[in-house]
């Protein structure tokens, strides 16, 4: 890291606050903008009176295939922490399928070869939608089509219902045409069926070890075939909805498809299993359950001897899983790595739901520390409840811990993620999201007062939108309503930009408003600029206006 010679007032300490899921929309609360609907005396003052820009946080600006693709916390923190844009999992897998490279790779050959050699089942397990945040249904269909071409004897599908990155009750919109397609494959002689499933926030897709019981519930239905039996996934979904009309897809209970009283697709010795999610955070725990010899998170029972692969590798440091179909993005020279190599003290803090984002994803999908002597990571455990029941989440404890760290003044760079806007936003509960935002307003104000006292520059931004659009909108931007005239909740991320504001106790630093198409990739250089360091080669430029 080289000190910059351009500026006289730099060499400042920095706090970066990431308000997860807090995008910018000019629309009002009547359109589902929970940020506009909240009373935010401090944040509104920040956005209106302090230097503020709106920067891109979706689509190609964060490495997604197109500008129709939402941003998400994983890619957002990758870009924030690396200062550059890398092709992300969605694009890498799509490109590999289009080129055929995925099917010419060693891992795919081993997956198919194992099933053919043992005359066994190929199991495909993953999120079942086209949300393109964790997975895409087209990837699953491509794997199925290729497996049939290569004459795999039997295919079983274990579907995790979304309703989070897509409309909250859209499961049958994906399932019905998919089952029609499967039926045509069966008529052509393919032994293929859905075997199990459930909502993504009920089974299998836990992250950051927040709730291993989710993974255990998934294990029971996918592997053991233990659970409530149904003749089809459609019957399961319709039954659960009739029993609880308010339930949304992500919280649907687990189910097992049976035939004559027996599960149609238990995972057994000799089978091949591919996890079809490309995003890592919610893929790691189920991958450990399939591959870890000394596993102690729950009783797996007799562990089936299977050949397991991920569509991508989910943790490069842990080599998890060892077998993967597409290589993940190779993110190097991150801001955290540069700072650690120069012995610049860093502090990272969040609650469990976003802790991995300010560490693992920020550091380019790398676990652990670069240099434990100069880095301090702090996790505050999240509650295991639906977050609209407690919209403040752990924001108060985070604020108190960060105030303490700022007052101790041991580090030069601090980063924190407040999960509320995203995690409460994902519940689709507009009023709870308003409450979450109002609680955050006071937290950010407290931190600014501490920064003023310690002469620390404060940057406030977000990784993507969510709370800014809580109702489904039609193509004309009008709110879509249900049969009772109520707005249809939206639980997914948005395509909106995010604000970034700079609060300088010395009131010297200004943004360069003439910079073309700024995005999250500009934030890393901005941090270094304020701290008095030159921008590393290849990084997107700083947002700071040069001194005249």
Swiss-Prot record:
One of its GO terms (biological process) is glycolytic process. It holds the Pfam family Metalloenzyme. Disulfide bonds: none annotated. One of its GO terms (cellular component) is cytoplasm. It comes from the Bacteria. GO terms for molecular function: manganese ion binding; phosphoglycerate mutase activity. Its EC number is 5.4.2.12. It catalyses: (2R)-2-phosphoglycerate = (2R)-3-phosphoglycerate. Mn(2+) 2 binds at residues 20, 73, 463-464. Substrate binds at residues 134, 164-165, 200, 207, 279-282, 354. Keywords: Glycolysis, Isomerase, Manganese, Metal-binding. InterPro entries: Alkaline_phosphatase_core_sf, BPG-indep_PGM_N, Metalloenzyme, PGAM_B_sf, Pgm_bpd_ind. The active site is at residue 73. Mn(2+) 1 binds at residues 422, 426, 493. The keyword Transcription does not apply. Binds 2 manganese ions per subunit. Pathway: Carbohydrate degradation; glycolysis; pyruvate from D-glyceraldehyde 3-phosphate: step 3/5. Belongs to the BPG-independent phosphoglycerate mutase family. Monomer. Catalyzes the interconversion of 2-phosphoglycerate and 3-phosphoglycerate. This is Probable 2,3-bisphosphoglycerate-independent phosphoglycerate mutase.
């Amino acid at each position: 890291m080289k000190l910059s010679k351009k500026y006289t007032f730099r060499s400042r300490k920095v706090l970066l606050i990431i308000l997860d899921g807090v995008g910018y929309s000019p629309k009002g609360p009547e359109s589902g903008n929970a940020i506009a609907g909240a009373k935010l005396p401090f944040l509104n003052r920040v956005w209106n009176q302090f230097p503020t820009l709106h920067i891109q946080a979706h689509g190609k600006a964060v490495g997604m295939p197109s500008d129709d693709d939402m941003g998400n916390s994983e890619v957002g923190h990758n870009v924030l922490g690396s200062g550059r844009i890398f092709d992300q999992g969605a694009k890498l897998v799509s490109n590999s399928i289009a080129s055929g490279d995925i099917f010419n790779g060693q891992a795919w050959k081993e997956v198919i070869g194992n099933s053919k050699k043992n005359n066994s089942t190929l199991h495909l397990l993953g999120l079942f939608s086209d949300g393109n945040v964790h997975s895409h249904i087209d990837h699953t269909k491509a794997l199925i089509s290729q497996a049939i071409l290569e004459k795999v004897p039997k295919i079983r599908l274990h579907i995790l219902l979304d309703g989070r990155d897509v409309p909250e009750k859209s499961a049958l919109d994906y399932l019905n045409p998919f089952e029609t397609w499967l039926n045509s494959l069966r008529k052509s002689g393919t032994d293929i069926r859905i075997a199990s499933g459930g909502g993504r926030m009920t089974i299998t897709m836990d992250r950051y070890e927040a709730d291993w019981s989710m993974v255990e519930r998934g294990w029971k239905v996918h592997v053991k075939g233990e659970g409530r039996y149904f003749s089809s996934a459609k019957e399961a979904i319709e039954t659960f909805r009739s029993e609880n009309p308010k339930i949304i897809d992500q919280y649907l209970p687990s189910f097992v498809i049976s035939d004559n009283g027996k599960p149609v697709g238990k995972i057994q010795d000799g089978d091949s299993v591919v996890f079809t999610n490309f995003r890592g955070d919610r893929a790691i725990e189920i991958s450990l359950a399939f591959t870890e010899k000394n596993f102690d998170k729950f009783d797996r029972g007799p562990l089936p001897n299977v050949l397991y692969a991920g569509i991508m590798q989910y943790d490069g440091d842990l080599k998890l899983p060892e077998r993967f179909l597409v290589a993940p993005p190779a993110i190097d020279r991150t801001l955290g790595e540069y700072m650690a190599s120069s012995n610049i003290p860093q502090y990272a803090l969040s609650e469990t739901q976003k802790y991995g984002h300010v560490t693992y994803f920020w550091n380019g999908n790398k676990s652990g520390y670069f240099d434990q002597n100069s880095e301090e990571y702090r996790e505050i455990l999240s509650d295991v409840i639906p977050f609209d029941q407690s919209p403040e989440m752990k924001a108060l404890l985070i604020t108190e811990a960060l105030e303490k760290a700022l007052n101790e003044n041991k580090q030069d760079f601090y980063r924190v993620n407040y999960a509320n806007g995203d995690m409460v936003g994902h519940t689709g509960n507009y009023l709870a999201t308003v409450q979450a935002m109002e609680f955050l307003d006071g937290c950010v104000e407290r931190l600014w007062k501490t920064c003023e006292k310690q002469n620390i520059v404060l940057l406030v931004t977000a990784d993507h939108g969510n709370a800014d659009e809580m109702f489904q909108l039609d193509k004309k931007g009008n709110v879509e309503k249900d049969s009772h005239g109520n707005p249809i909740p939206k639980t997914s991320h948005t395509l909106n930009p995010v604000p970034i504001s700079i609060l300088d106790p010395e009131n010297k630093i200004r943004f360069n408003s003439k910079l073309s198409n700024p995005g999250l990739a500009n934030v890393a250089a901005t941090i270094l600029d304020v701290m008095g360091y030159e921008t590393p080669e290849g990084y997107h430029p700083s947002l700071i206006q040069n001194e005249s």
